[in-house]
Amino acid sequence: MKRITLFTILSALFYILPLSAEEATYQDLRYTLDENHLTAEVALNTQATGEIMIPEKIIVGQNTYTVTSIADRAFKGCKNLQTIVLPQSIDRVYRSAFDGTGIMLNKDNWQEGCLWIDSILIATDKTIKPRFIVPEGTRLIAAGAFQGNKTIVRVDLPTCITRIDHETFRDCKNLQKVVIPPTITSIGEDAFLNCGIYQNEKKWKKGALIIDGCLVATNKLLPAKYVFKSKKPIRLIAERAFAEREQLKTVVIPNTITVIPAAAFYQCENLTNVTIPATVSHVHKFAFYGCKLLKQATLPTHLKYLGMGVFYECENLREQVLSDSIEILEQGTFYKCHTIKQITLPAQLKRIDHGVFAGCSSLEEIKLPNTLEFIGNMAFAGCAVLRTITIPEGVTSLPKQMCQGCTRLYRANLPDGLYAVGDEAFAGCLLLEKVNIPKSTFRIGVRAFHNCQQLESIALTPTNIHMIEEGAFQECKMLMDIELPERLKVLSDAVFAQCISLKTIKFNQKLREIGTGAFYNCRNMRELTFNDSIQVIGDEAFAECKNLRKVSFPITIKRIGVSAFQNCESLKQPLFPPEIQIGKNAFKGTRK
């Protein structure tokens, strides 16, 4: 069966949720940026040649990013890449980053079976000694550096190394011993998969493989209730160590553990209870991803970090109280945790990333702290029973789909200083009755309030609104009166389409153009008085407004679009000077 890697999980998450990372080019090299941590990873650069010097920091826009890693296959196949200088800030080099490069193909770059770049062990070959002592002064070992090497029998790691990266010793069939120093703080996924140690049944105890106090893997013999036991205290769990163990129901993590690594309990679908000790300071990405029966996972009061998608689709997870030490909730942390009703957010929280609470269909209440500065796309989308939300003043822009599909949300309190309401921010909030638009607001996004069926009124004046985008208030079926903001010059397509209760619209003095279908099927509208600024009425702008009886057109009008007033049954077709461009069927179905 094909193994599901962390890369696969990330790809799936990014398919569902918007990416929080972005790419940028700096001095002819491509980087992937992490805005949460202001770090950069050297991305795929397949055209690299000659000599390259990676900088320690790059500047993109207003931010300075520290370059910390080289991506998987970053320079793979760059045969003309002869030299590369890596900064001290690099702490990870992913698998195959330099495969097929001129650096790897040049035999002069190899020493005793090892390829080194700036004190980083990149790769090994069959000429390595069977017992290899990694020298002190080695900065790090690249992911997969020993992978598939059949020569090595024993590896002694130095105290200067802090991480064994993913697939480092994978498929090393003759490897029987690795000396892991206490300085090692993390072990990547599949670091020992199918190596000689892994294949030796005598090394396994009760379904777990433990090396020098590090639990590196588990198998099908793992009991339903796992208690950490070893001659040495278990101080470390490898990434994905318990992943997909369907038999696992209960885990008591000992107080010798300080970190729960990435995907540690990924898709343990029958896991119901996890005891996390107070010693744990970091819970990394996807740690409990897809643990659908998990009910209890009490987080330590002094937890410092909660990673991306930690409780993603933990459908039975109950109330959570988050440590005040946490400043960022990363992407998809509680995505589709259907049974969470309440959650206590950190007092110093600054950022809620994309989709953090999306699909939390039982979440009744959430109090956002005043320290909050950023809310990501879909942060509360699909929180079907959430009733109210108050956005703190530090938030200056509402993201896309922030509360989309919050079908019972009836009130949204927006802060002074708000600049924009994002696309579909409140779309499908069927019971939304009250929302204040601050004076500072510049833009209301595409379908921002689409299908808010109980929204009776919304004050667009006095505000700084320059843009109301397509379908912003489409299908707001209870909306009765609208006064357009004074700075608005163009009314976008379908803005008030199918607002079937809309009776009056007060146009401003600067409006020049009304977009396609802007008031389509506003069937309770009876009278229109345009100001002298109006020049263009778009296609189907007022089509199907069946009770529209009177329209006063200004002399400034230049074009009336196709089917602009089609099927306005109560409207008598007006006469226009010949210089006005009138589209086909503009008044079809009106009284003559």
What are these regions (language model features)?
Residues M1-T5:
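Positively charged n-region of N-terminal signal peptides that target proteins for export
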Residues V216-A217, E540:
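Small beta-barrel nucleic-acid-binding modules, principally OB-folds
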Residues D28-H37, Q47-S69, K79-Y94, T101-D118, ...:
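Structural signature of tandem-repeat unit edges
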Residues D72-A74, Y94-A97, A143-A145, D165-T168, ...:
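Consensus positions within tandem repeat domains that build extended binding/scaffold surfaces
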Residues F7-I16:
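Bacterial N-terminal signal peptides
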Residues A40-E41:
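Non-globular, low-complexity intrinsically disordered regions
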Residues L19-Y26:
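Boundary at the C-terminal end of the N-terminal hydrophobic targeting segment
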